[in-house]
Amino acid sequence: MDQPSPSAEDSQPERQSTGTRGTRFWAVFVSLCFASFVASLDITAITTALPTVTRELDGGENYVWIANSYTLASAVVQPLIGQISNIVGRRNPMIILMCLFALGSGICGGATSTGMMIAGRTVQGLGAGGILLLLEVIVCDLVPLRERAQYVGIALSTCALGISLGPLVGGALVQHATWRWVFYINLPCAGVALVALVLCLNVQHKREVSWGRALARVDWVGNTIFIAAICAIMYALVIGGSVHPWSSYQVLVPLVLGAFGWVLFHIFEASPYCLEPTMPPRLFRNRTSMTAYVLAFLAAMLMQWVVYFLTLFFQTVKGQSTTMSGVDVIPFTGFMIPSAIVGGAIMSKTGVYRPLHWAGFALLSICMGVFSTWDAGTPRAEWVILQCLVGLGHGLLLTSVLPAIQAALPESDNAAATSAYAFLRSFGFVWGVEIPAVVFNGQVDRFISRVHDATVRNKLAHGGAYSLAGTSFLSQLGDEADAVRSTYTDSLRTVWQVGMAFALLGFALVVVEKHIELRTTLETDFGLEGSENRAATSVEGVETGPVSKAQ
């Protein structure tokens, strides 16, 4: 049965009024939104700068690590951060994570080698992943489930704004200054965000009697197994097909070990030896939350898929500069903002989420199918309209998946459920670069024979085609330019077709979900500090009875 599980009897969380939002709520909310904007800006700013960064640091096929180290780091620590925030509260982890993000940005800006860049991106990812996770956790602490999509929609719209401006900012800085300022620009922004968090983020939590007791509650064994397993899997995926053949032991050994570790992690989490699991098995014991987790993974993967490879399309097939390629993807990234807000408002008003999921994946399927027909002659009106539609689809999914997960779970599981959701979303971001990169590199190697110049062929082969993207490369090719452009065009065609298949899978999986009534009351241990209101009210401010169960 898909219904909310009962909360622990010994817990008496605060039942907060939701009729009005006071000054303290908005101070917390705005500071969180600004912090998430700063962290989100760097997610896509690297997309337009990546070919230049890879070329200047002589990264070659390691360009996927520059992108993936950020998303991998942000993914693997999210369950740990979620659990720590449950134990020590939300405030201190959020402040530390913002400091980590700033430190990573400084390392990236001063990078003199690919290894240093990857290290900096890893530190950045640790901070940004935790910031975006705690943004949603804290909003869930302050807002009941029925309203949650609306407020999460507004909060994530600031993320979408950062994502929208990222390619433009990254391209402009690369073209008119230096790629290093793509990272240095984060430092003053992070400083402002840090001050806002210190002054405004005052939320309560149950304090342990000592730090030793608090640290003893952390699932260190489970998190160690989890992080090692995910890192092994991603290492195999990144080097597979580019550095080593998929059948080689260098790929198979970490892949098998990672898969074994993933299974071992879940066995340990379900065992009596794990007293406080990072990712409790009960999160996955009903079909609605389990399906919604898969949808979250697919939606995130396809979002990254579109962002990275639309930029590549404009730089190579359309011959745009890095700055203009950032401008050209604004219809996609920018349209997610109003779409996310509208989707959240629809869910808050109607209390339904399945139609939004169907509409979102239907739009992704159609648009990615049409993307596969694009070439150098595709008119501007077509690619603008299609990007708006795919942005609409992503926006609808952005705010509607998490409430579907939480609807079947008690409020006490909010942090754990949100952490698992954030991990799968971040893991999806990693796959959203890796899968299309593998497809793209394989297709380039397949079509590269049409290029007659052996020197050019060698530069394009084995992952080199991505790092060479940009008009400066194509303008130097002379008679070979058309052959190289057609290689990019046909390779991207297959990338979009594979993406369409994943979007269709998401559309089909919505059938498995079940409608569950969204709660209109809020019970939490992590409300605003100093709150004394313990009256349970509905969204409209009228007292309600017990939490509604599934229909």
Curated annotation (Swiss-Prot):
The keyword Membrane applies. MFS efflux transporter; part of the gene cluster that mediates the biosynthesis of aspirochlorine (or antibiotic A30641), an unusual halogenated spiro compound with distinctive antifungal properties due to selective inhibition of protein biosynthesis, and which is also active against bacteria, viruses, and murine tumor cells. Keywords: Glycoprotein, Membrane, Transmembrane, Transmembrane helix, Transport. The keyword Membrane applies. InterPro entries: MFS (IPR011701), MFS_dom (IPR020846), MFS_trans_sf (IPR036259). It is a multi-pass membrane protein. GO terms for cellular component: plasma membrane. The chain crosses the membrane at residues 26-46, 64-84, 93-113, 125-145, 154-174, 181-201, 220-240, 251-271, 294-314, 327-347, 356-376, 385-405, 420-440, 492-512. Glycans are attached at N286. Gene3D superfamilies: MFS general substrate transporter like domains, Multidrug resistance protein D. It is found in: Membrane. This is MFS efflux transporter aclA. It comes from the Eukaryota. GO terms for molecular function: transmembrane transporter activity. It comes from Aspergillus oryzae (strain ATCC 42149 / RIB 40). The gene is aclA.
